[in-house]
C-alpha cells in the first residue's frame, strides 16, 4: 500500500499530476485544492489513495492528510465514487466541505455537478457525526489560491477546459462556461474559473 509519493513534479494540470520518483513517473488524480497547494513548486509530497478495480489501477493524491481523510469519508457514502469525491473537493475547499456537512447545508452541496438533493442529504447524514469526531480542523488547502498571480487569459481558458474534460464534462459546454466566466472575471485564476464552471455545468 502506498502512503505517499514524494518527488519532482514532471507534469501538472488542475486535474492530474505526474510525480517523478527516481525516474519512475506516477500519474496521480488530484483535486483543485491540491493543485492550488502544489502549483509553482518543483517538487511535492502527495498522500495517496489507491483505487484498485478489475479494469483500472488509479491513484488519487492529496496535499495533506486532512483532504485525504475527507476523500475517504466521501467515498464511504453510498453512491459517491472517487471521481465524484474529487469533484466535491474541487468545488469546495476542505474547510467549506466540513462547514457544509456540520451545518447540514444540503443546498450548497448539491451545487456540485452530479450531486442531487438525496445524495447531498445522504452525505450529511452519513458524515455529520464522523466530521465532528474526526481530526477535522479543516485547514483550507485552497486558501492560497487567491494569492496566485493572474495567468494569461488564453492559458487559463485552455487549462480550465482541459481540466473540465478530464473530469468528464464535454468540451463544448465546458468551453462555453469557461468563456462566460472569463468574460465576467478576466483576471480570475484557473482554480477559480474551474470552481465556478463546476457549479454551472
Curated annotation (Swiss-Prot):
One Pfam family cited in the UniProt record for this chain: RuvA_C
Annotated region (Domain I), positions in chain: 1-63
Family the entry assigns: Belongs to the RuvA family.
UniProt keyword terms in alphabetical order: Cytoplasm, DNA damage, DNA recombination, DNA repair, DNA-binding
GO cellular component: cytoplasm; Holliday junction helicase complex; Holliday junction resolvase complex
Residue segments, region Domain II: 64-142
NCBIfam families for this protein: ruvA
UniProt keyword Cytoplasm, yes or no: yes
Annotated source species: Bacteroides fragilis (strain ATCC 25285 / DSM 2151 / CCUG 4856 / JCM 11019 / LMG 10263 / NCTC 9343 / Onslow / VPI 2553 / EN-2)
Any single GO BP term: DNA recombination
Compartments where located: Cytoplasm
Oligomeric and partner information: Homotetramer. Forms an RuvA(8)-RuvB(12)-Holliday junction (HJ) complex. HJ DNA is sandwiched between 2 RuvA tetramers; dsDNA enters through RuvA and exits via RuvB. An RuvB hexamer assembles on each DNA strand where it exits the tetramer. Each RuvB hexamer is contacted by two RuvA subunits (via domain III) on 2 adjacent RuvB subunits; this complex drives branch migration. In the full resolvosome a probable DNA-RuvA(4)-RuvB(12)-RuvC(2) complex forms which resolves the HJ.
Region (Flexible linker): 143-153
Protein name: Holliday junction branch migration complex subunit RuvA
SUPFAM superfamilies assigned to the protein according to its UniProt record, in alphabetical order: DNA helicase RuvA subunit, C-terminal domain, Nucleic acid-binding proteins, RuvA domain 2-like
Keyword Cytoplasm: yes
Biological role: The RuvA-RuvB-RuvC complex processes Holliday junction (HJ) DNA during genetic recombination and DNA repair, while the RuvA-RuvB complex plays an important role in the rescue of blocked DNA replication forks via replication fork reversal (RFR). RuvA specifically binds to HJ cruciform DNA, conferring on it an open structure. The RuvB hexamer acts as an ATP-dependent pump, pulling dsDNA into and through the RuvAB complex. HJ branch migration allows RuvC to scan DNA until it finds its consensus sequence, where it cleaves and resolves the cruciform DNA.
UniProt domain comment: Has three domains with a flexible linker between the domains II and III and assumes an 'L' shape. Domain III is highly mobile and contacts RuvB.
Gene from which this protein is expressed: ruvA
GO molecular function: ATP binding; four-way junction DNA binding; four-way junction helicase activity
InterPro entries for this protein: DNA_helicase_Holl-junc_RuvA_I, Hlx-hairpin-Hlx_DNA-bd_motif, NA-bd_OB-fold, RuvA, RuvA_2-like, RuvA_C, RuvA_C_sf
Highest taxon listed in the record's lineage: Bacteria
Annotated region (Domain III), positions in chain: 153-201
Chief location bin: cytoplasm
Amino acid at each position: 500500500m502506498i502512503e505517499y509519493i514524494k518527488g519532482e513534479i514532471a507534469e501538472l494540470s488542475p486535474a492530474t499530476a505526474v510525480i517523478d520518483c527516481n525516474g519512475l513517473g506516477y500519474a496521480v488524480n488530484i483535486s483543485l485544492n491540491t493543485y492550488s497547494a502544489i502549483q509553482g513548486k518543483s517538487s511535492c509530497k502527495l498522500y495517496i489513495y489507491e483505487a484498485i478495480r478489475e479494469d483500472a489501477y488509479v491513484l488519487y493524491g492529496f496535499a495533506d492528510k486532512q483532504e485525504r481523510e475527507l476523500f475517504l469519508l466521501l467515498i464511504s457514502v453510498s453512491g459517491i465514487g472517487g471521481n465524484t469525491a474529487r469533484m466535491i473537493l474541487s468545488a469546495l475547499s476542505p474547510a467549506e466541505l466540513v462547514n457544509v456537512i456540520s451545518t447540514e447545508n444540503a443546498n450548497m452541496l448539491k451545487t456540485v455537478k452530479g450531486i442531487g438533493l438525496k445524495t447531498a442529504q445522504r452525505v450529511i447524514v452519513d458524515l455529520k457525526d464522523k466530521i465532528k469526531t474526526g481530526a477535522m480542523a479543516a485547514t483550507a488547502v485552497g486558501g492560497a489560491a487567491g494569492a496566485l498571480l493572474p495567468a494569461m487569459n488564453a492559458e487559463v481558458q485552455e487549462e480550465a477546459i482541459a481540466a473540465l474534460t478530464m473530469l468528464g464534462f464535454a468540451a463544448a459546454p465546458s468551453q462555453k462556461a469557461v468563456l462566460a466566466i472569463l468574460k465576467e472575471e478576466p483576471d480570475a485564476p484557473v482554480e477559480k474559473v474551474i470552481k465556478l464552471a463546476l457549479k454551472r455545468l
